[in-house]
Amino acid sequence: MPYNFCLPSLSCRTSCSSRPCVPPSCHGYTLPGACNIPANVSNCNWFCEGSFNGSEKETMQFLNDRLASYLEKVRQLERDNAELENLIRERSQQQEPLLCPSYQSYFKTIEELQQKILCSKSENARLVVQIDNAKLAADDFRTKYQTEQSLRQLVESDINSLRRILDELTLCRSDLEAQMESLKEELLSLKQNHEQEVNTLRCQLGDRLNVEVDAAPAVDLNQVLNETRNQYEALVETNRREVEQWFATQTEELNKQVVSSSEQLQSYQAEIIELRRTVNALEIELQAQHNLRYSLENTLTESEARYSSQLSQVQSLITNVESQLAEIRSDLERQNQEYQVLLDVRARLECEINTYRSLLESEDCKLPSNPCATTNACEKPIGSCVTNPCGPRSRCGPCNTFGY
């Protein structure tokens, strides 16, 4: 910042009312904060005209030159500082739309991916539970299928045994029919033989004479034969009826058993077909679930790989941004150090200005209001007026100021 100041006049038009102004010490000293500027003050002799000697004028000229150079350096440093601040502001404005939205979008993408991963995990767990349930159902159906298969084998064995019994009954029936045919043939042969014998006897008796003899009544052979024949026929008919009735009952029972067995066999076959269809459908569904699980696992692996690569890219971007921020911080620290240096320079410059002002004030105090009293004032040995060169000084009286 520019420093505006005014220098006190080289001549004092008013006199000190309370006490006489004394000059500084006649010994040489160095101004603090003035980088070892020679500020030797000459002897205590004063001109009556109130002007400075040659050494004091050179010191004031040197201080003015140093002050001008310091002010120019301060202005240059302020311009450099403003340029650096503008450059930092431009870089921050250029990088701001790249940092904040990109981080927010990456965070949103990461949250969405985490939600998708959680949904995939829950879906995988649900599929695993469904697969376990399907496995349990398949095991139940397998046990039922094995039970029904054993029942089917038992029914088939019963059917085979019944078929053997049916074959045996068929053989018995054929045997009985053969026996009945043989009995019929035997009956016919007996009838033929009986008729032949009757005819033969009739022929023999027809040629003989009829002799009436008182004897027991003759036996009617035809009647006996008819009775015998009737008895045999009744017996044969009874046996035939019994055999037919037994055969009918056995056949009916076998037919009922065969019908019931065939119905059970058909029901078992239909149930077996249905169970096979169910098992095939469950196997197809299980294979589809396995394929879905494999595809989901592959998709999850690909998603994890892709998102890990994206995360590594984001981490690298974050690392680059952090390095840029570290550079900016280092630049800011360097600028702060430069600013501290400028503040130190300013403090030293203000100290020099205060020293310069105190020197001018002390020189103003040296100028006497009465030129004739100069010798008396200078003859008194008084110590130095400058006790603290860097502090403000009180003036002996009002003085005019001008720009040097």
Swiss-Prot record:
One of its GO terms (biological process) is intermediate filament organization. Residues 364-404 are annotated as: Tail. Keywords: Coiled coil, Intermediate filament, Keratin. Residues 1-56 are annotated as: Head. The keyword Coiled coil applies. GO terms for molecular function: structural molecule activity. Gene3D superfamilies: 1.20.5.170, Single helix bin, Vasodilator-stimulated phosphoprotein. The record marks A305 as: Stutter. Pfam families: Filament (PF00038). Residues 57-91 are annotated as: Coil 1A. PROSITE patterns: IF_ROD_1, IF_ROD_2. Residues 103-203 are annotated as: Coil 1B. GO terms for cellular component: cytoskeleton; cytosol; extracellular exosome; extracellular space; intermediate filament. Residues 204-219 are annotated as: Linker 12. Residues 92-102 are annotated as: Linker 1. Residues 56-367 form the IF rod domain. Residues 220-363 are annotated as: Coil 2. Belongs to the intermediate filament family. There are two types of hair/microfibrillar keratin, I (acidic) and II (neutral to basic). This is Keratin, type I cuticular Ha3-II. The gene is KRT33B.
